[in-house]
């Protein structure tokens, strides 16, 4: 069952971020953040500094998209 992780960090360009993602392990959540920030802002991994990774309860999540993903109890593939 995936968990919700809140990742806090900043980039070398001075941009601070706080992102919530779903992942199985903290390492997977960090990889997802590297991918998201890197593709959105054209930054390499060296330019992204992760400061904090915390597991968050679904009730504490701020992102609506993450809340909706966690509400899904099954996926049917045709």
From Swiss-Prot:
Ranges in a coiled coil: none
GO CC entries: ribonucleoprotein complex; ribosome
Keyword Manganese: no
SUPFAM superfamilies found in the cross-reference section: RplX-like
Keyword Phosphoprotein assigned: no
Source superkingdom: Archaea
GO terms for biological process, alphabetical: translation
Family in the record: Belongs to the eukaryotic ribosomal protein eL20 family.
Name under which the protein is recorded: Large ribosomal subunit protein eL20
């Amino acid at each position: 069952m995936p968990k919700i992780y809140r990742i806090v960090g900043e980039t070398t360009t001075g941009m601070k971020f706080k992102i919530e993602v779903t992942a199985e392990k903290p390492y997977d959540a960090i990889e997802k953040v590297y991918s998201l920030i890197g593709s959105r802002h054209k930054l390499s991994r060296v330019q992204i500094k992760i400061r904090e990774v915390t597991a968050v309860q679904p009730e504490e999540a701020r992102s609506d998209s993450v809340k909706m993903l966690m509400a899904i109890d099954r996926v049917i593939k045709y």
